């Protein structure tokens, strides 16, 4: 059995309680995790009880800490974004982040042909860790 939990926004107590009680084969955290510390630390109590997977949400790039606690965690390889994984015998596909209409249907003609071109033209002061601005790390 797979359990899905969405929009926990840093509150994992109910996830820990339900997993400890029901022992599902796997869980998938559906966006807006906003872990207050590395994800493996938040979920330490259940690491040996279940497989843990996640799909990031728009709020998971709100701050450096939100980003690092998820994408820099020991569970970063459990990110389902942009891929299909077999979880407890079921294929699950992930598309995380936020759909930004301005990216897909801008009010003017396209300004950039690629993320690389956008990054080059956005100016060093607008870059995050010498790449895309942090908020666009979750843009679809």
Residue ranges and their predicted role:
Residues 1-9, 89-98:
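Active-site-proximal beta-strand elements of phosphoester/diester hydrolases
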Residues 5-87:
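Core catalytic region of metal-dependent phosphoesterases/phosphodiesterases
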Residues 90-140:
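Active-site-proximal loop/helix segment associated with metal-binding centers of metalloenzymes
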């Amino acid at each position: 059995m797979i359990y899905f939990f969405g929009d926990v926004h840093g509150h994992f107590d109910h996830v820990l309680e339900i997993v400890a009680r029901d022992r599902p084969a796997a869980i998938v955290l559906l966006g807006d995790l906003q872990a207050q510390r590395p994800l493996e630390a938040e979920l330490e109590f259940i690491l040996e009880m279940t497989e843990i997977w996640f799909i990031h949400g728009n709020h998971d790039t709100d701050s450096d800490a939100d980003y690092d606690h998820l994408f820099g965690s020991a569970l970063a390889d459990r990110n389902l974004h942009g891929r299909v994984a077999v979880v407890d015998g079921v294929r699950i596909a992930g598309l995380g982040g936020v759909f930004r209409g301005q990216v897909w249907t801008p009010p003017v003609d396209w300004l950039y042909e690629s993320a690389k071109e956008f990054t080059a033209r956005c100016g060093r002061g607008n870059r995050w860790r010498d790449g895309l601005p942090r908020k666009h790390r979750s843009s679809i």
